[in-house]
């Protein structure tokens, strides 16, 4: 995070998308920074995107200080949230995707032992960076849409795993159905479980054997 006010003003007035890293900032400071930029944009008819990067300004960042859950808090600001990763390895970056990060920044080096400069130790070499890309892509696939819907593969087995309302025992014609008369078995090709109110208290038109479907057509 660069707190040079004139620089922030100049950057905001370029009218370009802005990505901001938030090291050594708390939530109140982040809000003020976003408001500062949006105010300039509003006064200059600029419409652009802001992305904020959760960041811990520590090299390397210790696992117990990575504070990845802060990504969720930053999402309350209704802008794109990313993660600037200074931990050793790629686990934190991959986990950040599951928490909502949509941009990943990771330092890159040809060799972790290239020099004594701290960045080389916490950076990813070509092999690890390739692994990071693949794991982030896979994490995105695993997250899915976020909507609890029946998946395509589930539709193939849906009828087989759902249950239907059947007779718990042999039921004679004119039996008035009660809870004790009902059972629920697979497949779900009959009246689905959860529709018991449609049959309870109704009279059977004809006999139903144990395990047979109870259908609306057979009710008076």
Segment roles from a protein language model:
Residues 1-220:
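Catalytic cores and adjacent flexible loops of soluble metabolic enzymes
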